[in-house]
Design a protein with these regions (language model features):
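Transmembrane alpha-helix boundary signature
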Residues: 43-76, 92-109, 129-141, 328, ...
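Transmembrane helical segments that form the transport core of multi-pass membrane transport proteins
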Residues: 60, 79, 101, 108-110, ...
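Interfacial loop-to-helix junctions that mark the boundaries of transmembrane helices
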Residues: 1-4, 24-27, 55-59, 67-84, ...
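Juxtamembrane and boundary regions of transmembrane helices in multi-pass small-molecule transporters
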Residues: 4-7, 153-154, 158, 174-175, ...
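Alpha-helical transmembrane segments
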Residues: 79-89, 195-213, 265-278, 352, ...
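Membrane-interfacial helix-loop connectors
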Residues: 40-51, 78-79, 130-167, 171, ...
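Hydrophobic mid-bilayer segments of alpha-helices in multi-pass membrane transport proteins
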Residues: 6-15, 26-62, 81-93, 244-254, ...
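Hydrophobic alpha-helical transmembrane segments
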Residues: 9, 34-35, 85, 120-125, ...
């Protein structure tokens, strides 16, 4: 391996270590992620020709067109990253609008219970199925906002939020539109909607239920319900009950509509999110105009122009840094080589290969890992590598559920980390092993079903 490649890997690993020890260093993870981005790509530019020849063998421009080619590559990765960032910003803004204007108040009434454990199961089930319809990122944002209405104790809320991460990733794994990796495999024709739902549903349920059973032992007693409910209702009294419900259904219903919009128009999901944001923004402006408050400060605090300042930009910048740093690893061939090496070491055992890929997906972004697998392994007419074969279905499960093992291993984890201020160390100490147990149990259940039930 070239010295330059090793240097890029060292920068990534060092940055990852600093992110993991944020609670000790007190340096914001977004700052480290941005330095990782710049460091990796700067080293890449020391000698980009070797990587162009490796990853883009069709390039024939020579040294003269090298800079232009690399610029195009970076812009392509930035474009892919930007779609995620705009989706995230749009989803966070939509949920903030719904929350601040009282849209979640009635949901709180439905979910309300005094039992901590009863709430845990309600949260787990709702998150699991909502994630199959929405994506795990949007689902996590919605559920955290609901949790804030129900749970005042931050320690308890960290436990619930951790289960939200696990349930969101598990729910997204069995749905063709629930996770970006299943969308990739589905669009490529490697899995079918009916196949992945039928065969991955039970393993996904197992990977959620077992962690929930363990996590409920961390919750005892009854919830202390927020005393400020009357004040909260007063705070959102700008809108009538009907208007609040309209805001809720425009927001959450719009999020559910995004996959439908994508399937109809074939436009990226962030376009659908921006459509929903535009419609919801317009509706709230019309509602506020009807209040005749003009420039009165009290009546304008919850308008979208004010709420935009509440979007957590550090989370956005963290995503930017991580995704662009990982894209550099993809461009130097590390991820592809890693996948090929796994196949050789484990002699084509697809349970082990996909299992390891799932563990790796908790460390690096699962999108380039899955993309690398799609490029490495050809589709066969029959057997494990056929459409809906063991390899592709396990890849969908492992890449999705495996991200729960570390809090920065999935989009859901990263956004919950930012919203609830959960540290990497706390999650790794208290939750990682629980997520790993559920992950393994899901794989075992899949093996049992394929080996014994399908053999009947």
């Amino acid at each position: 391996m070239a010295t330059l490649t090793i240097s890029i890997i060292v920068v990534f690993v060092l940055g990852y270590a600093l992110i993991a020890t944020e609670s000790l260093t007190k340096v914001n993870k977004a700052a480290i992620a941005l330095l990782m981005l710049v460091g990796c790509w700067t080293l890449y530019m020391v000698d980009p020709m070797q990587y162009l020849q490796l990853m883009h063998p069709d390039y024939t421009g020579g040294a003269a067109g090298m800079v232009e080619k690399v610029t195009g590559i970076i812009q392509e990765h930035l474009g892919d990253t930007a779609t995620t960032l705009f989706f995230l910003m749009g989803a966070m803004t939509i949920v903030e609008i719904v929350d601040q204007n009282g849209g979640f108040n009635w949901v709180r009434k439905v979910m309300k219970t005094k039992s901590k454990r009863a709430l845990l199961w309600r949260i787990a089930i709702l998150t699991f199925f909502l994630s199959a319809i929405l994506d795990n990122l949007t689902t996590s944002i919605v559920m955290i906002m609901i949790l804030r209405k129900l749970v005042t104790d931050h320690k308890d809320r960290m436990v619930y939020a951790s289960l939200v991460i696990i349930a969101a990733n598990s729910g997204g794994a069995f749905s063709p539109i629930g996770d970006v990796t299943t969308i990739m495999l589905w669009n490529k024709g490697l899995i079918t909607a009916a196949g992945v739902i039928a065969e991955i549903f039970i393993p996904s349920v197992v990977s959620m239920v077992i962690p929930a059973l363990i996590l409920q032992t961390m919750l005892k007693g009854e919830l202390v319900m927020p005393e400020a409910s009357a004040q909260q209702n007063a705070a959102v009294s700008d809108f009538t009950e009907g208007q609040r419900k309209a805001v809720f259904w425009l927001g959450v219903g719009g999020l559910i509509f995004v996959p439908i919009f994508k399937s109809i128009t074939h436009l990226p999901p962030f376009v659908g999110i921006l459509l929903v944001l535009g419609v919801l923004w317009t509706a709230t402006e019309i509602f506020y105009r009807g209040l005749h408050r003009g420039q009165d400060a009290e009546g304008t605090q919850k308008r979208v122009t004010k709420l935009l300042s509440r979007v957590d930009m550090s989370t956005i910048l963290f995503f930017l840094g991580i995704l662009m740093a990982v894209s550099c690893l993809a461009e130097i061939g590390v991820l592809t080589a890693l996948g090929q090496g796994l196949n050789v070491v484990f002699d084509g055992n697809h349970y082990l290969v996909t299992g390891i890929i799932g563990v790796l997906s908790s460390i690096v972004d699962n999108v380039p890992l899955v993309a690398g697998c799609m490029g490495m392994y050809p589709v066969a007419a029959a057997g494990d590598m056929a459409v809906d074969g063991v390899f592709w279905q396990l890849l969908a499960y492992c890449a999705g559920v495996g991200g729960s093992m570390l809090i920065i291993g999935s989009a859901a984890g990263v956004v919950v980390m930012g919203l609830e201020k959960i540290t990497f160390g706390w999650y790794m100490k208290h939750i990682s092993w629980i997520a790993f147990v559920g992950y393994l149990a899901g794989i075992i259940s899949y093996w049992f079903i394929r080996t014994f039930l399908y053999a009947i």
